[in-house]
C-alpha cells in the first residue's frame, strides 16, 4: 500500500528509487504489499533494527506529521473511508512508540533522551502536535509521570550542558524551551503531578547558587536582562552611548522581559492551579530558595555564593502577580489573609534569626509557643502567597536593588585602580607584560560591572512591571494597617490614632520598654522584613523618572501606613527603618522639576488619616530619633531630621491646616513642642559649630597649599599629600554640616516668626541666645575672614544668607522680653557692635535687608545693650552671692530651686528641665531621673527672695545717701 510506504518511508522493493528505507525482515518478504497488519512490524524494524535511522524520535514525529497530511489530502477522495482505519492505526502505533521512546531510553537502536530533546528544542513548532498526542496517551495509560521524568530532567541537562549560555541572548532556544513547558502544563493532569518530577525540588543541602542549575524550573526562572552575559551583549559594546541610545536598549529588553514574565506566569499558574499538592509544592519550592538566600540582604553579600539577581527578581515578580487578585483596590478578599499566619506550626518561611518589629527573639518564641495553631489548621494559599511575596520583596528584589546601590562605588574604585595601574605601567617597562595582563582583567571587570548597572537600571525603569510591585506594596500597606487596627476593620472603617496615649514627658523620649510592652499583637512579633522590604523598595524606586510611585492612584495607602508607623512609636522599634520612611516622605514633599507641589502633597492635605496625624508624627520622631542604638547614632539623627525639616517646611508654606496644627500644638501641648524646639536648637548649635569650624580648616589648608605652590616655606608639619587628605575630609564634613544646618535654620526662621513664645521658655531661651550670639560673632567678628574659602557654594555655605537668617530670628523674637534678657546675659559673645557690623553688611554691602529690617535689628541691639547695663548694675547690687543660691550648672541665681532625688543637689527648675530635654538622668550621678520626682525647695527659694530684697534695699539706701 503506497500510503503506508509514504508515511513510514519504508519499502520492500530493492529497486525503489524514492530513497526510502529497505525493509530487511523475514516477517515481510521482499515485494510484499505493505498492509495495515504490517505497520507494527515496520515501525519496530525502523526503531530497533535499522542502523541507518540515527534520529528515531524525529522519524516518529515525521511519520505522525505525514500521516496528518495524508488525512487532509484524502479527506474528500472516494476511498477516504477505507483509508481512515489505516491512518488511525498508524496514529495509534506512532504515538504509542513515541511514548515508549520517551520513557525507555534504549528502546530505539540509536535512542538517547538528550538527542530527542535537542531535536525538539531546535524545531519545537514541528513537534507540538505529536507531543500533545504523546502526553494525552501517557495520561490515559497512567504513565504520565514516567514521561515527565524522562523529558524534564533531560531538558535540564540540555540547558546546563548542551548550550553555551541558556539566557536571553539565545532567543530561539529559550523561547522553544518555554514552549515545551507551556505545552506540557496546559494539560491539567500533567500540572497536577509536575512537582513530583525527579529534580523539581533541590536537596535540602543545595547551595543557593545551584538552584538555577539543579532544579527543573531553575533555568527558565533565570531568564532575565540583568544576567551578566545578557548585560554585556546589550550594553557592553558602547558604554559611552547617548541617553537616547541607552533608552532604546532599555525598551527593547523591557519588552522582551515582559513577554518572558508573562510566559513564566502562565507556566507557574498552571502548576498552582493543578492540584492542592502542586500548589503547596510551588510555595515550598519558592520558600526553600528564599530561606537559603538571607545573605542577599547582608552588609557585604557574597553574591557569587547566592542565587542570581535575575532568578530571585523573576520569582518576586511572579509572586507579586499571584497576589494581585486578593489585594486589588476593592479589598474584598483582604480578610482571607491570616493576620496570625506566623502562629502556624509548619511555616514554609524560616523565621529563625529574623529581627521582629518590636520584640526580642525570646518573647516572640514564647508568644508563638503559647498561641501555636493545631497541626491540621493549615494556612490558605492566599496567606502563604502574601507573606512569601513580602519575603521575596526583601530578599529577592530587595537584594537586587541593594546590589545596584553598591555598584556606583565599585565602578569608581575600579576606574581609580585602572588609572593607578596605567601610571605604574608608564614608568616601569620591566613589569609591562604583567601589568598589561592585569589591566586587561580589570578593564573587563569594569565593562561587566558597568554593563550590569545599565541592565539593572533598565530593569528598575520598567514601569509596567514596577507598577505591579508597588501595587502589591500599597495592598500590603492596607493589610498591615488592618492588623494594627484594634477592630481589624480597616479599610472599611477608619483606624483611630494614636493607639496608646502619647508619652509627652521630656524624660520619656527613649522609653523603649514601655513602648514594647504596649505594642499591638501580633504585629509586634512580625519579622521586620514585612515593613523593611516595602520601604527599601519604595525609597529606592523613587529615584527613577519612571517610578511607579509618581501619581499613583494607590499611593495614599502607602502614605497612610507610613504615617501610622511614625505616629505610633510602639509599632516599629528600628529607628533606621523609620528614618527611611521620613526620607521617602521628603521625596514626595519636595516640589517637582516644574515647581509644582510634590507628588505626595495632595495626600498630605486631603487624606483624613494622614492630615490628622502626620504633623505630630514628624515632630515626635524628630525628638525620639536622638537615639538609634547604633554606633553612628549621633550622625544618623541629622539625616532623619533633615528629611523631616524638608517636609515640615513644605507643609507649613503650602497647606494652611498644618500651620494651624503647629500653632495649636505650641499653645496646647507646650511640653511636647518645647521638646521639639530643644532638639532643633541642639542640632543647629552643633551643625553650625561643626560647619564653620571645618570651613575655617578648609580656609587654612587652602592657604597653606597655595603658599607652598608659590614657593613659600611650609608653616605646618604635614606633607602635601596628607594636607590634601585632610582638606578632602574637612570639605566633606563642612558640606554635610552646612547643608544640614541650612535646613534647620530655615525652620527656626519660619517658626520663630509665628510661634515666638515657644522659643523663649526658660529651658530654651538662654541656650538659643548663646547660639545666635556666638554664630553672629563668627560671621561678622574679627575672625570672620577665616571662613573665606574657594567656591563656598560647593559647601552649601552662603555666609550672607546665613547672616540674614540669624538676624531674622533676632527680629522675630525682638518683642519677647525673655529673649532680650537672655541675649544680654550672654557675656561671652554679646556685643552691640556686632549688630552694627551685620547691618553694614546686610544693608550697604549686599542690599539683602530693607531699611525696616535694619531699623528693627538696631532697635533690638539697643534694647539688649540697655538690658546688659541694667544686669551689670544688678550684679553690682547683689555683690558676692552665696554659693547655695547659685545654680550649679549655670552659675546664676536660682529662681525656682528644686532638690534632685538621688544626688540631693539643689538646681533651678528651668535648668533641670533643659537638661532632661536631651538626657533623662541626674547630671550629677547619671541615675535615671523624671521631672515629677524633683522636690521644690521652698525654704531655699524664700532665702533667695530675701537675699535679693535685702540687697536691693541696701542699694537704695546707698543711692539716697
Swiss-Prot record:
GO terms for molecular function: ubiquitin-ubiquitin ligase activity. It is found in: Cytoplasm; Nucleus. Pfam families: U-box (PF04564), Ufd2P_core (PF10408). CDD domains: RING-Ubox_UBE4A. It is an enzyme of class 2 (transferase). It catalyses: S-ubiquitinyl-[E2 ubiquitin-conjugating enzyme]-L-cysteine + [acceptor protein]-L-lysine = [E2 ubiquitin-conjugating enzyme]-L-cysteine + N(6)-ubiquitinyl-[acceptor protein]-L-lysine. Its EC number is 2.3.2.27. Gene3D superfamilies: Zinc/RING finger domain, C3HC4 (zinc finger) (3.30.40.10). Pathway: Protein modification; protein ubiquitination. One of its GO terms (cellular component) is cytoplasm. Residues 880-954 form the U-box domain. The U-box domain is required for the ubiquitin protein ligase activity. Interacts with CDC48. Interacts with the ubiquitin-like domain of RAD23 and DSK2. Interacts with PEX29. E4 ubiquitin chain-elongation enzyme specifically involved in polyubiquitin chain assembly. Binds to CDC48 and elongates mono- and diubiquitinated ERAD substrates presented by the UFD1-NPL4-CDC48/p97 (UNC) AAA ATPase complex to a chain length of 4 to 6 ubiquitin moieties. Delivers these polyubiquitinated substrates to RAD23 and DSK2, which target them to the proteasome. Has E3 ubiquitin-protein ligase activity, accepting ubiquitin from its cognate E2 ubiquitin-conjugating enzyme UBC4. Enhances ubiquitination at 'Lys-48', but not at 'Lys-29' of the Ub moiety. PANTHER family: UBIQUITIN CONJUGATION FACTOR E4 B (PTHR13931:SF2), UBIQUITINATION FACTOR E4 (PTHR13931). Present with 2600 molecules/cell in log phase SD medium. This is E4 ubiquitin-protein ligase UFD2. The gene is UFD2.
Amino acid at each position: 500500500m503506497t500510503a503506508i510506504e509514504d508515511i513510514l518511508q519504508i519499502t520492500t522493493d530493492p529497486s525503489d528509487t524514492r530513497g526510502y528505507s529497505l525493509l530487511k525482515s523475514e516477517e515481510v518478504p521482499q515485494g510484499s504489499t505493505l498492509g495495515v497488519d504490517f505497520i507494527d512490524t515496520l515501525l519496530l524494524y525502523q526503531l530497533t533494527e535499522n542502523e541507518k535511522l540515527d534520529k528515531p524520535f524525529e522519524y516518529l514525529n515525521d511519520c505522525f506529521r505525514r500521516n496528518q497530511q495524508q488525512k487532509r489530502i484524502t479527506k474528500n477522495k472516494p476511498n477516504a473511508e477505507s483509508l481512515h482505519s489505516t491512518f488511525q492505526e498508524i496514529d495509534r502505533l506512532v504515538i504509542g512508540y513515541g511514548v515508549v521512546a520517551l520513557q525507555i531510553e534504549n528502546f530505539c537502536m540509536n535512542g538517547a533522551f538528550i538527542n530527542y530533546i535537542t531535536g525538539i528544542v531546535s524545531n519545537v513548532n514541528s513537534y507540538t502536535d505529536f507531543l500533545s498526542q504523546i502526553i494525552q496517551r501517557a495520561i490515559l495509560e497512567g504513565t504520565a509521570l514516567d514521561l515527565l521524568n524522562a523529558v524534564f530532567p533531560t531538558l535540564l541537562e540540555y540547558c546546563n550542558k548542551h548550550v553555551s549560555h541558556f539566557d536571553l541572548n539565545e532567543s530561539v532556544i529559550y523561547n522553544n524551551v518555554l514552549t515545551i513547558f507551556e505545552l506540557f502544563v496546559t494539560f491539567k493532569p500533567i500540572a497536577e503531578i509536575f512537582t513530583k518530577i525527579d529534580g523539581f525540588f533541590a536537596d535540602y543541602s543545595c547551595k543557593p547558587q545551584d538552584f538555577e542549575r539543579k532544579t527543573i524550573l531553575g533555568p527558565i526562572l533565570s531568564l532575565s536582562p540583568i544576567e551578566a552575559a545578557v548585560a554585556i551583549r546589550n550594553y557592553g559594546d558602547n558604554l559611552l552611548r547617548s541617553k537616547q541610545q541607552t533608552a532604546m536598549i532599555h525598551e527593547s529588553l523591557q519588552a522582551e522581559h515582559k513577554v518572558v514574565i508573562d510566559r513564566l506566569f502562565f507556566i507557574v499558574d498552571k502548576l498552582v492551579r493543578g492540584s492542592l499538592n502542586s500548589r503547596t509544592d510551588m510555595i515550598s519550592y519558592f520558600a526553600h530558595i528564599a530561606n537559603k538566600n538571607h545573605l542577599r540582604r547582608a552588609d557585604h553579600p557574597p553574591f557569587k555564593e547566592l542565587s542570581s539577581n535575575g532568578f530571585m527578581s523573576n520569582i518576586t515578580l511572579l509572586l507579586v502577580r499571584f497576589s494581585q487578585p486578593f489585594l486589588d483596590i476593592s479589598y474584598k478578599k483582604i480578610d482571607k489573609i491570616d493576620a496570625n499566619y506566623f502562629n502556624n506550626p509548619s511555616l514554609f518561611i524560616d523565621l529563625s534569626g529574623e529581627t521582629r518589629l518590636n520584640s526580642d527573639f525570646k518573647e516572640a518564641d514564647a508568644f508563638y509557643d503559647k498561641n501555636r495553631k493545631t497541626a491540621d489548621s493549615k494556612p490558605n494559599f492566599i496567606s502563604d502567597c502574601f507573606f512569601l511575596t513580602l519575603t521575596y520583596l526583601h530578599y529577592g528584589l530587595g537584594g537586587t536593588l541593594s546590589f545596584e546601590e553598591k555598584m556606583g562605588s565599585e565602578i569608581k574604585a575600579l576606574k581609580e585602580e585602572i588609572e593607578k595601574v596605567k601610571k605604574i605601567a608608564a614608568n616601569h617597562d620591566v613589569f609591562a607584560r604583567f601589568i598589561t595582563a592585569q589591566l586587561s582583567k580589570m578593564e573587563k571587570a569594569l565593562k561587566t560591572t558597568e554593563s550590569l548597572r545599565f541592565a539593572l537600571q533598565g530593569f528598575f525603569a520598567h514601569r509596567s512591571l514596577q507598577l505591579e510591585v508597588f501595587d502589591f506594596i500599597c495592598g500590603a500597606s492596607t493589610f498591615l494597617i488592618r492588623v494594627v487596627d484594634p477592630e481589624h476593620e480597616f479599610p472599611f472603617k477608619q483606624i483611630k490614632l494614636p493607639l496608646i496615649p502619647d508619652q509627652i514627658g521630656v524624660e520619656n523620649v527613649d522609653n523603649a520598654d514601655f513602648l514594647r510592652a504596649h505594642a499591638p499583637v501580633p504585629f509586634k512579633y512580625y519579622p521586620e522584613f514585612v515593613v523593611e522590604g516595602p520601604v527599601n523598595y519604595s525609597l529606592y524606586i523613587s529615584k527613577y523618572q519612571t517610578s511607579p510611585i509618581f501619581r499613583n492612584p494607590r499611593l495614599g495607602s502607602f502614605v497612610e501606613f507610613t504615617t501610622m508607623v511614625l505616629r505610633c512609636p510602639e509599632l516599629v522599634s528600628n529607628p533606621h527603618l523609620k528614618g527611611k520612611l521620613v526620607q521617602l516622605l521628603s521625596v514626595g514633599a519636595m516640589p517637582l522639576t516644574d515647581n509644582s507641589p510634590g507628588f505626595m502633597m495632595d495626600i498630605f492635605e486631603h487624606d483624613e488619616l494622614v492630615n490628622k496625624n502626620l504633623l505630630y508624627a514628624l515632630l515626635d520622631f524628630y525628638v525620639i530619633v536622638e537615639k538609634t542604638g547604633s554606633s553612628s547614632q549621633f550622625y544618623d539623627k541629622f539625616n532623619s531630621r533633615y528629611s523631616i525639616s524638608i517636609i515640615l517646611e513644605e507643609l507649613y508654606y503650602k497647606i494652611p491646616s498644618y500651620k494651624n496644627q503647629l500653632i495649636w500644638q505650641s499653645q496646647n501641648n507646650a511640653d511636647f513642642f518645647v521638646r521639639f524646639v530643644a532638639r532643633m536648637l541642639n542640632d543647629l548649635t552643633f551643625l553650625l559649630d561643626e560647619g564653620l569650624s571645618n570651613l575655617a580648616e578648609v580656609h587654612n589648608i587652602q592657604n597653606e597649599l597655595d603658599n607652598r605652590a608659590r614657593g613659600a616655606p611650609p608653616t605646618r608639619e604635614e606633607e602635601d599629600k596628607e594636607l590634601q587628605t585632610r582638606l578632602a575630609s574637612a570639605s566633606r564634613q563642612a558640606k554635610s554640616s552646612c547643608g544640614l544646618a541650612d535646613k534647620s535654620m530655615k525652620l527656626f526662621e519660619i517658626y520663630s516668626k509665628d510661634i515666638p513664645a515657644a522659643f523663649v521658655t526658660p529651658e530654651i531661651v538662654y541656650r538659643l541666645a548663646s547660639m545666635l550670639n556666638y554664630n553672629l560673632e563668627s560671621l561678622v567678628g574679627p575672625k570672620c575672614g577665616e571662613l573665606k574659602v574657594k567656591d563656598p557654594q560647593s559647601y552649601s555655605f552662603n555666609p550672607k544668607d546665613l547672616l540674614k537668617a540669624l538676624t531674622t530670628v533676632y527680629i522675630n523674637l525682638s518683642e519677647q522680653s525673655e529673649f532680650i534678657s537672655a541675649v544680654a546675659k550672654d557675656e561671652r559673645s554679646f556685643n552691640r557692635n556686632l549688630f552694627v557690623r551685620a547691618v553694614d553688611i546686610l544693608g550697604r554691602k549686599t542690599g539683602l535687608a530693607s531699611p525696616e529690617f535694619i531699623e528693627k535689628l538696631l532697635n533690638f541691639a539697643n534694647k539688649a545693650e540697655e538690658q546688659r547695663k541694667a544686669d551689670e548694675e544688678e550684679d553690682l547690687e547683689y555683690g558676692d552671692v552665696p554659693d547655695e543660691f547659685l545654680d550649679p550648672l549655670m552659675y546664676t541665681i536660682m529662681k525656682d530651686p528644686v532638690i534632685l532625688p538621688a544626688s540631693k543637689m539643689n538646681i533651678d527648675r528651668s535648668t533641670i528641665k533643659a537638661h532632661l530635654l536631651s538626657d533623662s538622668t541626674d547630671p550629677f550621678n547619671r541615675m535615671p531621673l523624671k521631672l515629677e520626682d524633683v522636690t521644690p525647695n521652698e525654704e531655699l527659694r524664700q532665702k533667695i527672695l530675701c537675699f535679693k530684697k535685702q540687697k536691693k534695699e541696701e542699694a537704695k539706701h546707698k543711692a539716697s545717701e
